[in-house]
Amino acid sequence: MKVYDVGRICVKTSGREAGLKCVIVDIIDDNFVLVTGPKSVSGVKRRRANIRHLEPLEYKISISKGASDEEVKAALEKAGLIEFMKEKVKPTVSTTFV
């Protein structure tokens, strides 16, 4: 089991979207993944993100690789995580990269 796999819910730890939750939609390579909020739910636009700037959470939803924002939103509603995704959290900075 990988930590950063499709459907994993994460918190962005850096940038203007720091503290917002997102869902991994696709794995680009060893260092980058494609994430989305979707924007209508948590405010995170679909974009490439470095895995060093993500903090994985224990939640995972069942979506296919490359799922659209509508499919991600439907999966979040099915799992009952819409309100959870709207909450902003204070990201913790890992000491391994400082």
From Swiss-Prot:
NCBIfam families: PRK04333.1. Keywords: Ribonucleoprotein, Ribosomal protein. Belongs to the eukaryotic ribosomal protein eL14 family. One of its GO terms (biological process) is translation. GO terms for cellular component: cytosolic large ribosomal subunit. Coiled coil: none annotated. GO terms for molecular function: RNA binding; structural constituent of ribosome. The gene is rpl14e. This is Large ribosomal subunit protein eL14. Transmembrane segments: none annotated. Gene3D superfamilies: 2.30.30.30.
